[in-house]
Amino acid sequence: MALTERQEALLKQSWEVLKQNIPGHSLRLFALIIEAAPESKYVFSFLKDSNEIPENNPKLKAHAAVIFKTICESATELRQKGQAVWDNNTLKRLGSIHLKNKITDPHFEVMKGALLGTIKEAVKENWSDEMGCAWTEAYNQLVATIKAEMKE
């Protein structure tokens, strides 16, 4: 289902807030992932030996920022482009990595919950159910693209 103009506006409005602190929000995203599913730390080599989010870990900072920025930027472009706009190599890499790490629906759901929680905390009083629905729809579309690549 295509995003509406209103959903796109909500995504872009919240992205303006989020991109002011990508390092902080991306670390918060990972903290919420680990909080919701502690076993997920074993998917990330730089978290395997840690009981908490090591905020000064350069590998975590870099990886978290890339993931957070990729999700958010891709989400804000969905309506305009009509689909996730990743080049073929990026899409193949995303499919391959998720397949290799045996990422399944529950993992994607944990990520979605963490993403929504991070956004809600960041935008504070501007959060609404409508904004949450817009991010949920965008995230689901991005995940569907990755899952399709995982099957190939």
From Swiss-Prot:
For this record, the Gene Ontology CC terms, alphabetical, are: cytoplasm; nucleus
The listed location of motif Homodimerization is 35-39, 105-117
Identify which cofactors the protein needs according to its UniProt entry.
Answer: heme b
What Enzyme Commission number(s) does the record list for this chain? 1.7.2.-
Q: Which domain of life is it from?
A: Eukaryota
Which enzyme class?
Answer: oxidoreductase
Task: Name a Pfam family for this protein.
Answer: Globin
Q: Which UniProt keywords apply?
A: Cytoplasm, Heme, Iron, Metal-binding, Nitrogen fixation, Nucleus, Oxidoreductase, Oxygen transport, Transport
Q: Where does heme b bind?
A: 45, 59, 63, 93, 98
Reactions accelerated catalytically: Fe(III)-heme b-[protein] + nitric oxide + H2O = Fe(II)-heme b-[protein] + nitrite + 2 H(+)
Found, by tissue, as follows: Root nodules.
Where is this chain primarily localised? Answer: cytoplasm
Compartments annotated for it: namely:
Cytoplasm; Nucleus
How many and how are cofactors bound here?
Binds 1 heme group per subunit.
Q: Does this UniProt record's set of keywords contain Magnesium?
A: no
InterPro entries assigned to the protein according to its UniProt record, in alphabetical order: Globin (IPR000971), Globin-like_sf (IPR009050), Globin/Proto (IPR012292), Leghaemoglobin-like (IPR001032), Leghaemoglobin_Fe_BS (IPR019824)
Q: Which family does it belong to?
A: Belongs to the plant globin family.
Biological role stated in the UniProt entry: Phytoglobin that reduces nitrite to nitric oxide (NO) under anoxic conditions (e.g. during flooding or in waterlogged soil) and upon root nodulation. Required for general plant development and during nodulation, especially for the onset of symbiosis. Monitors nitric oxide (NO) levels during early phase of the nitrogen-fixing symbiosis and buffers oxygen in functioning nodules. May not function as an oxygen storage or transport protein. Has an unusually high affinity for O(2) through a hexacoordinate heme iron because of a very low dissociation constant.
Q: What is this protein called?
A: Anaerobic nitrite reductase SYMA
What taxonomic lineage is listed for the species of origin? Answer: Eukaryota, Viridiplantae, Streptophyta, Embryophyta, Tracheophyta
